[in-house]
């Protein structure tokens, strides 16, 4: 027998990286929020790599922070090592990456949820949604408890009909042998959602005491203090190193001779795996000309012996994994503590979502994270905060928020999912962003803090500090533009010492900074400020001045895009009434139901000729008929 158990504004099902951000975003806006999860000991658990950030992903973490989310603050408090990647390249591809103490990370995040007003945590298994008049109105648990809500967010990760595969062993399970969610997946199919089967994998964990580190290369963290959050002022200094080693020809020989026992090659695994995180079996087969592959040994925390063997994701049988490990330098006598495995799970086809992450089929139902076909904690968290913002705003009767492709990597991620869909676990890459010079690690606050403040996730105090920073950047740019650096003997000698050509006349500080050999530090030695300039302000001044021309070109492209984004398409347009559009384009337009001409132009299978016909009809107002 069912029973009424409670009434909420928002219910979030699942408390992984998407779920915690969704719940916090909802509750911090003032929406009464319930988090329902299978196991409260697994809040924000890291079932795969113990790290946060990296190319594109690290920028997403900064964006989450600029919007008022939690991932950045949490990793700043719980990391064991932090490094800035791609420092030798331009600012568009620089990214921060942290090794996490995975246990401290989840405990700290759970504590944050527990002390957040308007937020209730509950252990339980959601089996069905409450659907009234075609709209989602709550959830029913395994025990028959009925929780009503104005909106519901599904953040189920890899739990939907999860199945672990290890050699010829296969059993129903969520990640790390957690209980899977079977009935909810079946219920989504009953409701008419199209589901796909995806797969991911994880490598073995080994005991640190059994590693011979003398045969590996140390990988220390950066000596310079780093942080993801713009609010962090206290930095962890006692960092732990990671270690680099390599597979050997013997490793590859063992893999080759046991491919018949690999679930990937025997046909046992049906789900599609992530292209950018292949298993070691896949790497050895696809790149058989490579004599070795990198293996990083990453501690899983400060108070555990477990070490994550990055680069050795596998579902080969346990005995093969043990033999494989023993052929890797430094791991000859290693003790395997946990075997690697593959996990298959259900995901929904993401073109069934609006850009708000609300489902088209069932109003008031939102989805975020791996259920939408993505891979990675950061991609999940980025979707989670947007789903939580929008579910909360809809429940409170406010207008929902959509980030564009020029606003944030989160905008690129969501637009790719809902417009193009994905036939494999989606990973965010810098190459997916057209405006990556605008979407940098260093300027996430300048792009998104105002939005976060308007939503109510950024405090007035933090917003005032942000406004002061913006003003300081403009003031310093103005000062350097107005100051003239003269060709005095001392100045000429200094410029020559940097490898630059002498000045012919006096030059503005900003113009001098655009020279390849000059930067903010060198220019301000010739034209020092009256008082010290904060490092983050100096960094912005240098990037905005040195890359001014490129940034201006990108901004012009964004303006063109905005014109197309502003050409809205009526929600109930009848594409069958538009003559001349190709059959494939018509089918795709009907499936995706784009909100604007710009979004329509990004749909796979919709060509410029189809867009031209659509524009003519829209501009002439010839579409009077709409689909019933």
Swiss-Prot record:
Listed Gene3D superfamilies: FAD/NAD(P)-binding domain, GidA associated domain, C-terminal subdomain, tRNA uridine 5-carboxymethylaminomethyl modification enzyme MnmG/GidA
InterPro entries from the UniProt entry: FAD/NAD-bd_sf, GIDA_C_N, MnmG, MnmG-rel, MnmG-rel_CS, MnmG_C, MnmG_C_subdom, MnmG_C_subdom_sf
Biological process annotations from GO: tRNA methylation; tRNA wobble uridine modification
Keyword field contains NAD: yes
Chief place of localization: cytoplasm
Cofactor: FAD
Residues given in the record as FAD binding sites: 14-19
This protein's GO CC annotations: cytosol
GO MF annotation, one: flavin adenine dinucleotide binding
Cellular localisation: Cytoplasm
Alphabetical list of Pfam families matching this protein: GIDA, GIDA_C_1st, SAM_GIDA_C
Keywords: Cytoplasm, FAD, Flavoprotein, NAD, tRNA processing
Binding site for NAD(+): 273-287
Family: Belongs to the MnmG family.
Function (record text): NAD-binding protein involved in the addition of a carboxymethylaminomethyl (cmnm) group at the wobble position (U34) of certain tRNAs, forming tRNA-cmnm(5)s(2)U34.
Quaternary structure (record): Homodimer. Heterotetramer of two MnmE and two MnmG subunits.
The protein, known as: tRNA uridine 5-carboxymethylaminomethyl modification enzyme MnmG
The species this protein was found in: Bacillus velezensis (strain DSM 23117 / BGSC 10A6 / LMG 26770 / FZB42)
